[in-house]
């Protein structure tokens, strides 16, 4: 796009400022330019002089608020795309992350859109927990003047599919809100459903909200944008694996790898707290086994995203083979009329249990059938990348990114099975081999801005990963704030991940305290939550001193047990009852002093 620049004498910018402005906007799309224009208009109108000079609008325009509640970035992408659609339609829209939303203002919302994912056992994303609690509390206001719509993202391989969206949708209606549209529940392959839903939302809102004047069509309150980079989930960087080191002992029941990936001169940047997305390939041996069980050859042509590929290639690169789902089991049973599987159809609990305990290849082995190649790929879900908490800081490792990978290995009736991405990194990528990666930024898991703030890190197992990044960053920054680590695993001698590094940080005074829980080294099992209770008095002192608390690891059990221990510590040493302790912890969450990266 070429813009005719007025003579410099007529501009309020000097040549250097003009050059910087042109350089910054050269590659922007029309939608992005519109957003930038609106952003500067918003900045201008925050100035007192500008406020005084701005005439009052003739009539108040009802604003549209989009709340993004995202765990891995997908919900945020949908929310941002909807925001752009509404701006293009010249509607007044505000996009805000659930974690930044002042939820007590929800009663004043006229048009409210919620885009949410689900984590754990049907729980809302971390950034939406406080909002969810508020809406389900006695403090929630009536919403008779609010019209709303909900788009819910989930994974049908989990029992509580899209539960967070279902919760928000039902509660907003219960509080008196009017549904603009019926809720949409989208599976892993959500893009088509999201595109259709966005179009319907725009049409519905056009009749509700008048078209804005140019100065009103502004995307205000936009936070936690997908960071600008030439590399993304859909356009990953082809990097190289430089280190693959087993960091559990020879006799450990766990196979945990320290993986280092060379980013080269890509310029890819990340921060402690971010995740690394890894696109993996299925094991060729697994592909071969599945193809042969179905009496196929593997060279049959199939269509994937408009391209014709041999079946073997399609299965290796494009379809999920290591995670079964209730839908796949049900569809396979119906398609093959399997006498073993048909009795499960219609029984959600039995389907979920079977899918959780029986990989796709073993389902086919136990209930053999003959499918053509197209029927097979229509049965499967698209392959999706896996996210790993980043275990390094670029202040220390520069053009590298490190992750801590727990390799999933198990047997099904004597046959070795493994996780798709973890075994890809551990077993099938050779040194200097190619790995397609991208950064998934997570602004809801960040070190305190003030380097003097104390930090409490709770990360058993591979949950230790982001805290290695945190400590590298705190050491590089020479941050004077105290640091306290709680770590746990089965055995001290076999499972003390990054032991030498933690001991060095303690010796250097960077790590102020470390408490370790070894669950199998004594008769009575000890976990990190037990250590929290044991150190309750000191923990409360740190919290009173303004400490930020971070939890990383398993969402289903560990995170809940840790939160219960924190509530007990707060109640006992803070002199609160259960309800007050819960409110206190919720306030810490709202203040970003209690952050979790759980999965």
Swiss-Prot record:
Keywords: Amino-acid biosynthesis, Cysteine biosynthesis, Electron transport, FAD, Flavoprotein, FMN, NADP, Oxidoreductase, Transport. FAD binds at residues 322, 356, 386-389, 404-406, 410, 419-422, 599. FMN binds at residues 70-75, 117-120, 153-162. Residues 64-202 form the Flavodoxin-like domain. It catalyses: hydrogen sulfide + 3 NADP(+) + 3 H2O = sulfite + 3 NADPH + 4 H(+). Residues 234-448 form the FAD-binding FR-type domain. GO terms for cellular component: cytosol. This is Sulfite reductase [NADPH] flavoprotein alpha-component. It comes from Escherichia coli O157:H7. The gene is cysJ.
């Amino acid at each position: 796009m070429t813009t005719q620049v007025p003579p410099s004498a007529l501009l309020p910018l000097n040549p250097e400022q003009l050059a910087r402005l042109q350089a910054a906007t050269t590659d922007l799309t029309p939608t992005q330019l519109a957003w930038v224009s609106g952003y500067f208009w918003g900045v201008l109108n925050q100035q007192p002089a500008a406020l005084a000079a701005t005439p009052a609008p003739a009539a108040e325009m009802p604003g549209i608020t989009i709340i993004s509640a995202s765990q891995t970035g997908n919900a945020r992408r949908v929310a941002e795309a909807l925001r752009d659609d509404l701006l293009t339609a010249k509607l007044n829209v505000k996009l805000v992350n659930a974690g930044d939303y002042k939820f007590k203002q929800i009663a004043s919302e006229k048009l409210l859109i919620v885009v949410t994912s689900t984590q754990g056992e049907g729980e809302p994303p971390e950034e939406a927990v406080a909002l969810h609690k508020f809406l389900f509390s006695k403090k929630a206001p009536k919403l008779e003047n609010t019209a709303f719509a909900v788009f819910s993202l989930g994974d049908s391989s989990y029992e509580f599919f899209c539960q967070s969206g279902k919760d928000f949708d039902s509660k907003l209606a219960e509080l008196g809100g009017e549904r603009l549209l019926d809720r949409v529940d989208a599976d892993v392959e959500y893009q088509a459903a999201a595109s259709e839903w966005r179009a319907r939302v725009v049409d519905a809102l056009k009749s509700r909200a008048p078209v804005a004047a140019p100065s009103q069509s502004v995307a205000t309150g936009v936070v936690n944008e997908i960071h600008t980079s030439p590399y993304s989930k859909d356009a990953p960087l082809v990097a190289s694996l430089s280190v693959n080191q087993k960091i559990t002992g020879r006799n450990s029941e766990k196979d945990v790898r320290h993986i280092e990936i060379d980013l080269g001169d890509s310029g890819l940047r990340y921060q402690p707290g971010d995740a690394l997305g890894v696109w993996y390939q299925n094991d060729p041996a697994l592909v071969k086994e599945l193809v042969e069980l179905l009496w196929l050859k593997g060279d049959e042509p199939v269509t994937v995203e408009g391209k014709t590929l041999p079946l073997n290639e399609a299965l290796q690169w494009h379809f999920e083979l290591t995670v079964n789902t209730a839908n796949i089991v049900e569809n396979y049973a119906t398609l093959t009329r399997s006498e073993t599987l048909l009795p499960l159809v219609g029984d959600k609990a039995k389907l979920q249990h079977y899918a959780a305990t029986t990989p796709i290849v073993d389902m086919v082995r136990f209930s053999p059938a003959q499918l053509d190649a197209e029927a097979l790929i229509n049965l499967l879900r698209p392959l999706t990348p896996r996210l790993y908490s980043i275990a390094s800081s670029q202040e220390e490792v520069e053009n590298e990114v490190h992750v801590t990978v727990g390799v999933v290995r198990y047997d099904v009736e004597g046959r070795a099975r493994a996780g798709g991405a973890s075994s890809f990194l551990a077993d099938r990528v050779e040194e200097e081999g190619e790995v397609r990666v991208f950064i998934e930024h997570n602004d809801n898991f960040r070190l305190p801005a003030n380097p003097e703030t104390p930090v409490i890190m709770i990360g058993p197992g591979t949950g230790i990963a982001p805290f290695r990044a945190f400590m590298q960053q705190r050491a590089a920054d020479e941050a004077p704030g105290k640091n306290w680590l709680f770590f746990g695993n089965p055995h001290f001698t076999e499972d003390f991940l990054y032991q030498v590094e933690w001991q060095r940080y303690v010796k250097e005074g960077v790590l102020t305290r470390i408490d370790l829980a070894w669950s199998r080294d004594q008769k009575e099992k000890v976990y990190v939550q037990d250590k929290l209770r044991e150190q309750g008095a000191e923990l409360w002192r740190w919290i009173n001193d303004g400490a930020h608390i971070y939890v990383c690891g398993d969402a289903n059990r560990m995170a809940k047990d840790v939160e219960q221990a924190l509530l007990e510590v707060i109640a006992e040493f803070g002199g609160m009852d259960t309800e007050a302790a819960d409110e206190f912890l919720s306030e810490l969450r709202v203040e970003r002093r209690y952050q979790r990266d759980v999965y």
